[in-house]
Amino acid sequence: MQGMSGLMSITGEPEGQPQKVGVAVTDIFTGLYAVIAVQAALRSRDTTGIGQHIDLSLLDVATATTANQAMNYLTTGISPNRKGNNHPNIVPYCAVSTKDGHIILAVGNDNQFENFSKIFDADWYQKDKFSTNPARLKNRDELLNLIEKNTRSFSSLTLLSECEKF
């Protein structure tokens, strides 16, 4: 189902093969959709006295899980592709190396990016090529290289602690 729905085409490293998600997401999400459908049907029955027919398929749900990527395609015309741990629309939103391991960054807006830059005493947020998320998207590789050079001097716990301050 992950392959037929397109989910595998957007999962994995950019230069790698399509990959399955590490857990049975299609089965899990279908179960969750079923619970929601049953709750809605029970509510409808309580209100109208009429029962409902619920019809779910693994493929429909697997396809629904690609909604954000589908929206990107429908609004830009650009087919989604694998980005590894990078977010397709937000930078930095990825795994980075630290002195003793890795952490996942999720810097979701320009204010957070300014605060994040200050952890490293960097003026990245003041540079036009990094000051806004659209600019960071265009200059993703350059920025991620700068970030990675700096995160490697922190332990994971120290960097997480610094990030949690903002």
Region roles according to the model:
Residues 91-166:
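Aromatic-enriched alpha-helical interface/lid elements that frame and gate functional surfaces
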Residues 1-103, 107:
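Active-site-adjacent "lid/gating" segments in soluble enzymes
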